[in-house]
């Protein structure tokens, strides 16, 4: 008699995805972030669900309801801070996951990669709408500034913004619909994650060398289940350290002031994980140009398979490309720093140079470096 996990229609899917899945024998800890992202998503959905039971999406009571959660609901404070800092953890894992994909050439699995880019956009949209819900000063002004960017779209821009707002400014209708979408999107993300995994399991995982590993595979369980459990333990420990010791470290003090449409905060800035894109947006004096650069800064990831000019898939044996990759990482860290600074000299010019360098590295320097390395192989 065959094992039930191999014969039962439902268990068979789980078995083929998590137990008997053939995996390369040499994948490093950089391959842990997929499972960590799954755990982050589960934490966010669970904490979000319990928060939604006590939250009210009305402009008059939203801020008060968040205060009520923190003060009066049993363990409400830990739910709130797990959810807020869980988002930061989510983005740390996301950036490392994407960085791993860029470094080791995982983008050559085009379907998996493209679904991943869509997932990135969906998570960013969800995080943005979630930031609006506490209805603090930065929530309100962040929502106003970012939604207002759509008015740069020619002809339909203004109508589009007012349609999203549900009026002539960010108000009750906006908050209610943002709550509805913020609740809905994680479930759409969960469905997309399954599609992402479906495409991944069609090809199997890549590995650090970038060489096909069909001849050297091991079962996912117990080798990678135990490895993923260790990764999860480290991440959850880091998250709990953040939540229990410095829960407001990554937040903005302005968001502890209730939203006031008559008083603009001196420095409007998004959460830290959007600062790199915000810096690119601000570095272009033209509104439409800024919006296009903002969207393209993420959308450019879709072009990665087309920009791959190397004869090798991974950067493991390509020292010049490695230099370009780490230059890109340094550039993104610079942009993140600039995004949190006021718009004044010397930050303006640093932001503009870093923005130009960002697109230059991806579109020009990396492909050229790869071609040079191809020629060096012949020596």
From Swiss-Prot:
Membrane-topology annotation of the record: Multi-pass membrane protein
Example of a GO cellular component annotation carried by this entry: respiratory chain complex III
Sites where the protein binds a ubiquinone: 201
Subcellular location as annotated: Mitochondrion inner membrane
Molecular-function GO term, any one: metal ion binding
Cofactor: heme b
Cofactor binding mode and count: Binds 2 heme b groups non-covalently.
Record key words, sorted: Electron transport, Heme, Iron, Membrane, Metal-binding, Mitochondrion, Mitochondrion inner membrane, Respiratory chain, Transmembrane, Transmembrane helix, Transport, Ubiquinone
Residues involved in heme b b566 binding: 97, 196
InterPro entries: Cyt_b/b6_C, Cyt_b/b6_C_sf, Cyt_b/b6_N, Cytb/b6-like_sf, Cytochrome_b, Cytochrome_b_C_euk/bac, Cytochrome_b_N_euk/bac, Di-haem_cyt_TM
Membrane-spanning ranges: 33-53, 77-98, 113-133, 178-198, 226-246, 288-308, 320-340, 347-367
One Pfam family linked to the record: Cytochrom_B_C
Entry binding sites for heme b b562: 83, 182
Any GO BP: mitochondrial electron transport, ubiquinol to cytochrome c
Keyword Cell membrane part of the UniProt annotation: no
Main localization, broad class: mitochondrion
Oligomeric form and interacting partners: The cytochrome bc1 complex contains 11 subunits: 3 respiratory subunits (MT-CYB, CYC1 and UQCRFS1), 2 core proteins (UQCRC1 and UQCRC2) and 6 low-molecular weight proteins (UQCRH/QCR6, UQCRB/QCR7, UQCRQ/QCR8, UQCR10/QCR9, UQCR11/QCR10 and a cleavage product of UQCRFS1). This cytochrome bc1 complex then forms a dimer.
Function of the protein: Component of the ubiquinol-cytochrome c reductase complex (complex III or cytochrome b-c1 complex) that is part of the mitochondrial respiratory chain. The b-c1 complex mediates electron transfer from ubiquinol to cytochrome c. Contributes to the generation of a proton gradient across the mitochondrial membrane that is then used for ATP synthesis.
More details: Heme 1 (or BL or b562) is low-potential and absorbs at about 562 nm, and heme 2 (or BH or b566) is high-potential and absorbs at about 566 nm.
Membership in a protein family: Belongs to the cytochrome b family.
Protein name listed in UniProt: Cytochrome b
């Amino acid at each position: 008699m065959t094992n039930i996990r191999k014969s039962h229609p439902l268990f068979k899917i789980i078995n083929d995805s998590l137990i008997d899945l053939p995996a390369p024998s040499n994948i490093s800890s950089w391959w842990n972030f997929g499972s960590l992202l799954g755990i982050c998503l589960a934490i966010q959905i669970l904490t979000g669900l319990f928060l939604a039971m006590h939250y009210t999406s009305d402009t008059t009571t939203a801020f008060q309801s968040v205060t009520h959660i923190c003060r009066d609901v049993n363990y409400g404070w830990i739910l709130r801070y797990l959810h807020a800092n869980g988002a930061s953890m989510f983005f740390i894992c996301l950036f490392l996951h994407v960085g791993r994909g860029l470094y080791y050439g995982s983008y050559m699995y085009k379907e998996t990669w493209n679904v991943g880019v869509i997932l990135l956009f969906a998570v960013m949209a969800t995080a943005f709408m979630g930031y609006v819900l506490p209805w603090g000063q930065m929530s309100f002004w962040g929502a106003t500034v970012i939604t207002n960017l759509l008015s740069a779209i020619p002809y339909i821009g203004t109508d589009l913004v007012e349609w999203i707002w549900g009026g002539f400014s960010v108000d009750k209708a906006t908050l209610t619909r943002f709550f509805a979408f913020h609740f809905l999107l994680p479930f759409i993300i969960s469905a997309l994650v399954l599609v992402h995994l479906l495409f991944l399991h069609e090809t199997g995982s890549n590995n650090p060398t970038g060489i096909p590993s069909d001849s050297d595979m091991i079962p996912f369980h117990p080798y990678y289940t135990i490895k993923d459990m260790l990764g999860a333990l480290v991440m959850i420990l880091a998250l709990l350290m953040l939540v229990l010791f410095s829960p407001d470290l990554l937040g903005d003090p302005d968001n502890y002031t209730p939203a006031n449409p008559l008083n603009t905060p001196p420095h409007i800035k998004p959460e830290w994980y959007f600062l790199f894109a915000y810096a690119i947006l601000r570095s272009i004096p033209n509104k439409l140009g800024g919006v296009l650069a903002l969207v393209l800064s993420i959308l450019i990831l879709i072009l990665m398979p087309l920009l791959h000019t190397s004869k090798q898939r991974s950067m493991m044996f390509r020292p010049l490309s490695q230099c370009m990759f780490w230059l890109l990482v340094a550039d993104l860290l610079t942009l993140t720093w600039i995004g949190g600074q006021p718009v004044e000299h010397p930050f303006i010019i640093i932001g503009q140079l870093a923005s130009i360098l960002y697109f230059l590295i991806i579109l020009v320097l990396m492909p050229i470096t790869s071609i040079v390395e191809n020629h060096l192989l012949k020596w």
